[in-house]
Structure formats: C-alpha cells, structure tokens
A protein has these predicted regions:
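N-terminal targeting sequences that direct proteins away from the cytosol to non-cytosolic compartments
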Residues: 1-86, 93-103, 109-146
Length: 146
C-alpha cells in the first residue's frame, strides 16, 4: 500500500509536506487538439459535509460566474469503472472567439474527496467523442486493483 504521506507518480514520489494536500490534475492531450478532445482528471475536496450533488451545484455556480456564456445541463447519473456512481454535466462556454464544449463527471472517492473527469473540445461532441468518453470512464480501475 502506498505511503499516504508521499505523492506517487510514474517517475517516482515526493513527500507530501505538512499543510499541503494532493490537488493534482492529470492532462491528456491528443495529437490534434482541434479535432480530438482534451481529457483531464482532477482531484478535489468537498466543502464541509457537502454531498456529491451539492458539490456539482456549487461548481456549476462558480463556472457560471467565471466563464462567459456558460450553460450546463442538469446533472445525470454516470458510472466510473462500471461500479462507482457519480454525476455528469454537459456544458459549453466562450473562451474569446472560441466555443468550448465540455463534459465533466464527478465521483466521490471518500467522504471528503472527489475525482473530476473532464473532456473538452472546441468542436461539438460527436459519436466518436461519446464512445471515447464511455470507454475512458469504463476503463477506470481503483489503485488497489490497477
């Protein structure tokens, strides 16, 4: 079992210093980002006794305030690795002259921590992007099974 006082990554590990927590983001960039979506996984923390639904609602409100033209769907159920339930939101907003399409799925991995999977693209999502999203989420394995 990994030492919880160290941050582990492919190339090695480093101590997690007192007062710091892991909020890393893993970004996966395609060879052609104009045609294929970017993917990322972020780690976050719930605020107090916040539920998954509360977390998603808070994040949507924050994004509406920060991103011009941000529009989001109602949260919908989604599964990670076929077993862990979460909530997904489809959204779009403007970044300068570019429209950004985004899909996010949030999963509670403990009472305090969340994993946020994001797919974003300047192009509207098509059947290929939908298949990529489903395969990416379905392919998740918890650290103790990886």
């Amino acid at each position: 079992m990994p030492d919880p006082n160290r941050f582990h990554f492919d190339e090695g590990s480093t101590p997690l210093l007192p007062g710091y927590e892991d909020r890393t983001v893993n970004s996966f960039v395609p060879a052609d980002p104009q045609r294929e979506p970017n993917l990322s996984i972020a780690r976050d923390r719930f605020a107090g006794a916040e539920t998954l639904s509360d977390y998603v609602a808070r994040q949507v409100l924050l994004l509406k305030k920060k991103l011009p033209g941000y529009k989001a769907s109602a949260p919908a159920p989604v599964a990670l690795g076929g077993t862990l339930g979460g909530l997904a939101v489809e959204a779009s907003y403007r970044s300068g002259a570019t429209s950004v399409h985004q899909r996010q799925a949030v999963f509670a991995v403990s009472d305090e921590r969340a994993l946020v999977f994001t797919m974003s693209s300047p192009r509207a999502f098509d059947a290929a992007a939908d298949a990529l999203w489903r395969a990416w989420l379905a392919g998740f394995r918890p650290a103790d099974e990886a």
